[in-house]
Amino acid sequence: MAREFSLAKTRNIGIMAHVDAGKTTTTERILYYTGKIHKIGETHEGASQMDWMEQEQERGITITSAATTAQWDGHRVNIIDTPGHVDFTIEVQRSLRVLDGAVTVLDSQSGVEPQTETVWRQATEYGVPRIVFANKMDKIGADFLYSVQTLHDRLQANAHPIQLPIGAEDDFRGIIDLIKMKAEIYTNDLGTDILEEDIPEEYLEQAQEYREKLIEAVAETDEDLMMKYLEGEKITNDELIAGIRKATINVEFFPVLCGSAFKNKGVQLMLDAVIAYLPSPLDIPAIKGVNPDTDAEEERPASDEEPFAALAFKIMTDPFVGRLTFFRVYSGVLNSGSYVMNTSKGKRERIGRILQMHANSRQEIETVYSGDIAAAVGLKDTTTGDSLTDEKAKVILESIEVPEPVIQLMVEPKSKADQDKMGVALQKLAEEDPTFRVETNVETGETVIAGMGELHLDVLVDRMKREFKVEANVGAPQVSYRETFRASTQARGFFKRQSGGKGQFGDVWIEFTPNEEGKGFEFENAIVGGVVPREFIPAVEKGLIESMANGVLAGYPMVDVKAKLYDGSYHDVDSSETAFKIAASLALKEAAKSAQPAILEPMMLVTITAPEDNLGDVMGHVTARRGRVDGMEAHGNSQIVRAYVPLAEMFGYATVLRSATQGRGTFMMVFDHYEDVPKSVQEEIIKKNKGE
């Protein structure tokens, strides 16, 4: 099958937002107007097309990023729906990694909310161009210009309206296009009948003012436009559109649009903006990777003529076809039935069938071209972030960073039959979601699952029950603490055993130093002159890694420590890998006496919205929970308090806030960083873990 849409006419976009900003409804409307759905599904009726897992339909939130393909104005638009809830950040990160552009949906009553900040920050890290859609203009309290202001204040974004609303709340009836300087008036409920008229008299002055601001902002990003602007020459609409496109693709400018997806207003204009301002695969830099055979850096430009290279960004288990691997093709062409190399794992994979996904239905295709997104059936060893490439032109593309889990639960199967099924279920769920970890406590035999938050683990336990029919008892959530060293030290680990026959002998000197936050464990071999033979060096590193998994203070995994093996000795006959592993673990224990070991706890960025009258209570809550306030701002009759609070102190806070504010207060929290726990708390944790 020949290529249907050229690369220039392809858009890979994500729709990202805070939970409840109306993202799924917006995606639904896109699918409706692009002819993919015949009836519109509402999230609050639990009938949405993109939310196809049962839990999503019940909770009215989007958990898995379903990839959908649609057509608009002669272009192919691949849409990845991303979740807005903070517990599912990996889903957002995975989708951002394979997108070329994104639409950020705001609730125009609230503007930028905490999760919007998190997703925006991630999109900035990945260099993703964005347009902003201020949604819910029909809602009470909707304020378009306030939303634009929050983009400046909270995100320091160079964002400017390219539209203005006509009316707001119940009176929201149309949109002013600041480029054409025309009014688009909606005359029916489905938003399919649009009248283009002159701008109403009472809005003309405001429209002229904001068009002038728009031209000035765009001119500042382009020298030629700036010269014209300063010399008072007229900038044509075509020049303005080209200027906006260039600045948006360079992530220097963010066009802001408005509408109400629920009331079917503004979605088609937003689709026009996706085509006009967001990049095609040709507009973004060629993806870079490393050749696994030569270690040389290589590029893969977007072209069907280049060798095949793709990134697997999502694994899903489908009840009908089994394991689906979603992938983005960066270069080359892939045919079903062919073989590819998984360069991340060094394994050859056969592509069984290739499917193009539409929310919950699928179309089988023979060939997928560069710049496209599809799902493959039949890949056995591929996991999230793996590179799939031509066998003759191997390359490893930059993978997807996985955040560490911050919360854990104990799960216990209800019966022996459940025990076997639970192992399989947890393994499958962990394959789909890299932020979900499963560990078995060697001493107690308990199974512990860890994830990004309570909702995250709730959903996974729920899926285990529904999809895999496993009945399990679930313990109370526990915080995932970590341990580290705060001072440098040198320590000896000496192990010698003589008990008839072959003895054991291992002797090492290791220097331990604190590592930068987030850098993890780093091992350096600085042995000179073979005082520890080469074949035993890996055993020393392994011995340290195994010991660090259980910490030195309270049994928590150690992070951010450098270990330099610089001296030692061995015995010709008695030295073995086991002896050096034990010696390394003894060195770690010895180091703990002088390296100032510390317990680290996850700190959450908590945003609390409460009525002005309850501000004192809220500040009291933060202080009582060992938190520190980072900032406050007024919004209508409410106050928004931002604070850093330990996760350990946040369990049950929803109930406390509800009763203090008569149900009017809300809060959101997102993991921010790890921090040392105070000495008194550290002593309590150690006591508790030693069962005192």
Curated annotation (Swiss-Prot):
Taxonomic superkingdom: Bacteria
Q: Does the keyword section mention Transferase?
A: no
Q: Which CDD domains match?
A: EF-G, EFG_III, EFG_mtEFG1_IV, EFG_mtEFG_C, EFG_mtEFG_II
Q: Name one Pfam family in it.
A: GTP_EFTU_D2
Q: Which GO terms describe its biological process?
A: ribosome disassembly
Query: Keywords, A to Z?
Result: Cytoplasm, Elongation factor, GTP-binding, Nucleotide-binding, Protein biosynthesis
Q: Where is this chain's protein located in or outside the cell? A: Cytoplasm
Q: Which family does it belong to?
A: Belongs to the TRAFAC class translation factor GTPase superfamily. Classic translation factor GTPase family. EF-G/EF-2 subfamily.
Name by which UniProt lists this protein: Elongation factor G
Organism of this sequence: Streptococcus pyogenes serotype M5 (strain Manfredo)
